[in-house]
Amino acid sequence: MQNFKHICVIGLGYIGLPTAATFAAHGVKVTGVDVNQHAVDLINQGKVHIVEPDLDALVRDVVAQGKLSAQIIPIEADAYIVAVPTPFKDDYQPDLKYIEAAAKAIAPYLSQDNLVILESTSPVGATEQMAAWLSEARPDLTFPQQAGEQADILIAHCPERVLPGKVLQELISNDRIVGGMTPRCSQASIDLYKVFVKGDCIETNARTAEMCKLTENSFRDVNIAFANELSIICDKLDINVWELIKLANRHPRVNILQPGPGVGGHCIAVDPWFIVSKTPEQARLIRTAREVNDAKPEWVIDQVKIKIAEFLQANPEKTIKDVTVACYGLAFKPDIDDLRESPALEITKKLAEQGINILAIEPNIKTLPQKLPNNVQLTDVEAGLEADIYVVLVKHKQFKNLCLNIKKVIDMCGV
């Protein structure tokens, strides 16, 4: 069993920082690395730059204990965990530039028997590509693609499987898929994660581990697309979709998900494209689901325009510049501050670009993203009640008991 006294986590975002803090809380010395100097400075003060329940207290404690520190360049360690973004390009092809940068950053510090784990959700083959970049940078060391079980450096893929808002609990309780490039790589990775993981660590190969995470999120995306398409059909047929789903789900083998304004975040809205990019002819259902979910924000915008037209018809003395729309929620899901790929943010931006005055109610952020026009004002729940039209885009807990005029509401999440 391999002993890991010091690990280095590359990328201190929504996955990297909780992972680093959890290892530190279980007695491992952790050095976190991030290119964001502001984030590094905050962490070293025992503070956090992201919203995740209980993370602030955990980071404060492990920094105070000297178990966690942060810096902008890597350091020699026993193991490296890469948790950097993996976006896609404009043509929906995966962009591995952050993985490449991480590989080149850690390469000078590698030594015999080091373990490198790619946690970033990645297209099939990304772990092998990372190994190739490392090998190119360190020809003095051997890697699994060259030396198999006798390699100097061990490499694996272990995708995160946590739910934002419950990250700290699920890091410990969830099962982990561990895909080494060789069985020895897998076993070393299991030894590392068993420092804190109480769920099962299930061994496979790197390519299957990569595809497993993509499959999980594509399954979710396809099922959400069904719910979103159903909501559009029900609107056309004048049927309450929330009541319909509740009734249909009373069938013992039916479990329809809840519709929404689209699909956001850096996983479900992105990962299916990694499958489509590799197998475009075969992934027809997965592509169609992505198209359905990507189109939902435009449908929401059309519903708002209809509501605005009705308002102006009832108030002929006013123009569109006199209309105020309250958008409740900007995050991609409830009770977090993550705006990545958020359909709510996209809807708010496009409505503002129509010249409509927007009141944005997002209790989990302090400032608006720069991409929003100047006619968007960040305000609180009470101030939003002064709007002419309400659009509920995210099911934040603060919106649970909203008392809104039903004639003025477009409810996209069943609040």
Segments the model singles out, each with a brief description of its role:
Residues M1-V415:
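Structural/interface elements that position substrates and couple domains in central-metabolism enzymes
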